[in-house]
Amino acid sequence: MHRIFVYGTLKQGCGNHHRIFGGYDIKITPAWTYGKLYDLGWYPAMTVGTDKVYGELIEFNNPEILKRVDYLEGFKGENHPHNYYERRLVDVFVGGATVKAWVYFLSVKQVKRYDGNHLITGVWLNS
């Protein structure tokens, strides 16, 4: 079983959700994790932090989905010098349970470069 936590364009109803997950068997559950969420304009970014960030836990068995998300997020491998986002395994909170899931993080340096706006609510709205 693979798990990823999504907080932006991959959430249900957002632009990349159907593009990546359409036609695949997935389970979606509201969830949250710790980080710091920013609006970069057309999409969000999360950095390491202590704020609550709200999104969805997506669970699936097909490893092709993870490859598709990696490609979308510009993740080429752990600590690869040309990564856009880094993928890390973190605790994600779902109801009363805690599970490990992959989350895509952007560096603080990149967020500053794109003049990211901190979203103190921990929620990115696709608007």
Enumerate the predicted regions with their spans.
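Glycine-aromatic micro-motifs
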Residues: 1-127
